[in-house]
Amino acid sequence: MALARANSPQEALLWALNDLEENSFKTLKFHLRDVTQFHLARGELESLSQVDLASKLISMYGAQEAVRVVSRSLLAMNLMELVDYLNQVCLNDYREIYREHVRCLEERQDWGVNSSHNKLLLMATSSSGGRRSPSCSDLEQELDPVDVETLFAPEAESYSTPPIVVMQGSAGTGKTTLVKKLVQDWSKGKLYPGQFDYVFYVSCREVVLLPKCDLPNLICWCCGDDQAPVTEILRQPGRLLFILDGYDELQKSSRAECVLHILMRRREVPCSLLITTRPPALQSLEPMLGERRHVLVLGFSEEERETYFSSCFTDKEQLKNALEFVQNNAVLYKACQVPGICWVVCSWLKKKMARGQEVSETPSNSTDIFTAYVSTFLPTDGNGDSSELTRHKVLKSLCSLAAEGMRHQRLLFEEEVLRKHGLDGPSLTAFLNCIDYRAGLGIKKFYSFRHISFQEFFYAMSFLVKEDQSQQGEATHKEVAKLVDPENHEEVTLSLQFLFDMLKTEGTLSLGLKFCFRIAPSVRQDLKHFKEQIEAIKYKRSWDLEFSLYDSKIKKLTQGIQMKDVILNVQHLDEKKSDKKKSVSVTSSFSSGKVQSPFLGNDKSTRKQKKASNGKSRGAEEPAPGVRNRRLASREKGHMEMNDKEDGGVEEQEDEEGQTLKKDGEMIDKMNG
């Protein structure tokens, strides 16, 4: 049998029916009585010719579904050649339907914080670096740049096909925007032509909304079509690419997690995978994967930073002023390497300029940057004047919402939840995104923070805005214990980084002034213990750095240094020396000391740290003579000093309110606050 190539499902259906012998055609009608949705009467079917039957089915179901209905009946008759013919026609036609669906999504896509399509720096690495942050581990090796176009090139790696690519990067580096742009480019034929029949984007944050999460429903959800031809789509798994975006945001112990884990192990569907994640989640992700390729997302180059500013500031004078302000602040300029933080900085400066306000803040770390943004965008009263009562109420409500989400692994919130916290979603677009989710015939609204970084910032703030010690409660102490428990996290989370910055003396004073609240003395006492607990573990863990060090020459910093027990800190000192040279100080430190909190007891981490406190720096060779830092526009040579500190140089210091606080005298990292 030689069936002609059909140009449409209608044509294919007619060809298949005409190819049947008379007895086979009668048998088909018999099967159609049972499989058709409206149960056609026997007499009605018997009188229909091939053309009439095709027309009747198409009018009842539409061309695509009519082909599927006939295909199921032919399968029952074991006419496999005709089944394969119809399935292939259906699949070929549905590919274009799906591409059109993806292209239409772009028009109503909310790209979130990282809405720019600027090119990002991608570096290929042979491994993830185990449990360490890529910012540290990959300094020890030469990183090769990689393009999105070559991520799945057959010659890219010697790994078995289909390939797995793990794309890792700190919060805000642009992973989500990058993969959404990848899907759009594929749908337009610009990327991977002829390589993938389908590229499915799965948000690990939003997949929990699926009422029934299994693989067929997941594919239908991706297609935006409850009647998607799942069986035909899965027939060639090697031509499928699933993009699992934000593995670190996947809700634990959920049905969605189970389904995605099955997909990652690729036993049932051996497809290509692209998984994006923040580094802390790699420890749980990697055991499920076989051979894979690791790519680091490192944010903007210098050129792309300026391009991004140009897209944000259309007024030339504002653009000039914004660039000058950022370039004159080494911390801000470095921070703007991260697209998410660059968006925060641009939005903050633009709002200040629109109000005609002078920018008096000088951020010294990422916490200061988020603080400046939040204090600028907190709502005003009806007259346009800032109302301390309104601002403080909204701040507390945002903090309580963020804390509830973090406690329950929740990143999406229904409107009722916002109302419970006294928040009005539409009026808080500076902090919240709205997502329209189709539930049956209706639309249900969900809200999320504009970026996970905002939720973690407000979560850290929630420890400070409580009005008295009773509000801290046992639950709060358990939360802090969980944050600092070394068994739970090999890396310091972003929430913990924010909290550590806030608990510094100058940090708490600054927050109180900006947000017009005073930290209650009893709460301050609790926070002191939290700070001591964080300091006890900060030397033992790697930090999930927001500002990735991508310059290949920076790897010289680790030459001759054993990174297992030594903590490496980079400081830019003497910025205003007359010779204009930027000194670079590298300090190694070992953890020591035992901190006891009345709420947390003798933490396991302190016992482990005491054992390590007697160590010595191993194999310290003479460091590289200089490091070029193109991100800070410096071509000068630096120098490095290696200093071993037994206890990190903790000193006692009195703050303005007479509270005894501990301050790290040697380990202050100017680049990360």
From Swiss-Prot:
Question: GO biological process annotations for this chain's record?
Answer: activation of innate immune response; adaptive immune response; defense response to fungus; inflammatory response; innate immune response; positive regulation of defense response to bacterium; positive regulation of inflammatory response; positive regulation of interleukin-1 alpha production
- Per UniProt, ATP binds at 169-176
- CDD domains from the entry? Pyrin_ASC-like
Q: Which domain of life is it from?
A: Eukaryota
> In which residue ranges is the amino acid composition biased (Low complexity)?
584-597
**What does the record give under GO molecular function?**
ATP binding; ATP hydrolysis activity; GTPase activity
**Where in this protein does the record put region Disordered?**
578-673
**Topology relative to the membrane, per the entry?**
Peripheral membrane protein
Composition bias, Basic and acidic residues: 633-648, 659-673
Where it sits in the cell: the answer is: Cytoplasm; Cell membrane
Listed A to Z, the keywords are: Adaptive immunity, ATP-binding, Cell membrane, Cytoplasm, Immunity, Inflammatory response, Innate immunity, Membrane, Nucleotide-binding
Location of the Pyrin domain = 1-92
Any notes on this protein's domains? The pyrin and ATP-binding domains are required to elicit cytokine release following bacterial infection. The NACHT domain is required for inhibition of CASP1 autoprocessing.
Record text on subunit structure and interactions: Oligomerizes. Interacts with PYCARD. Also interacts with CASP1 and IL1B. Interacts with NOD1 and components of the NOD1 signaling pathway including RIPK2, NR2C2/TAK1 and IKBKG/NEMO.
What name has this protein been given in UniProt? NACHT, LRR and PYD domains-containing protein 10
- Organism, as annotated: Mus musculus (Mouse)
According to the entry, what is the taxonomic lineage of the organism?
Eukaryota, Metazoa, Chordata, Craniata, Vertebrata
